[in-house]
């Protein structure tokens, strides 16, 4: 599966989607689903990594705000995918769970959440899901 993740870049995304459907038609739905999951996980991880790099290289306050908003947006995309458990592998979900908790509990991002909470709805839905799971345990 790692080889499949490495093979995907933005330039051949359409080819990757075509391959998913070909795999589903020829071999099995599970193989195609795993392939699509790997593609989605790769794209989500790339968007987080890119936002982190932009945040690290930001020089002005406006660049930092923009990079932070991009990072939160990337984490929000992960949360939306997390809500649809069939998309992400268990290991991928576990690796980002603590990060999402830290984001919601950190005062650093409160300003962004207050300015446009609808942009980060996925983060809040996943956070509520975690809280409810803790109460039930």
Give each language-model segment a name:
Residues 36-137:
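Amphipathic alpha-helical "stem/stalk" segments
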Residues 1-39:
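Membrane-embedded hydrophobic alpha-helical segments
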């Amino acid at each position: 599966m790692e080889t499949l993740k490495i093979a995907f870049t933005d330039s051949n995304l359409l080819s990757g989607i075509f391959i998913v459907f070909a795999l589903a038609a020829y071999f099995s739905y599970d193989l195609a689903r795993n392939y699509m999951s790997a593609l989605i996980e790769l794209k989500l991880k790339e968007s987080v990594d890119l936002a982190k790099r932009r945040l690290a290289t930001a020089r002005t306050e406006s660049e930092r705000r923009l990079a932070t908003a991009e990072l939160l947006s990337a984490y929000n995309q992960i949360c939306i995918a997390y809500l649809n458990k069939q998309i992400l592998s268990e290991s991928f979900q576990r690796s980002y769970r603590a990060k999402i908790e830290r984001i919601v509990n950190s005062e650093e991002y409160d300003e962004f959440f207050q300015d446009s909470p609808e942009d980060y709805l996925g983060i809040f839905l996943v956070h509520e899901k975690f809280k409810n799971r803790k109460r039930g345990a």
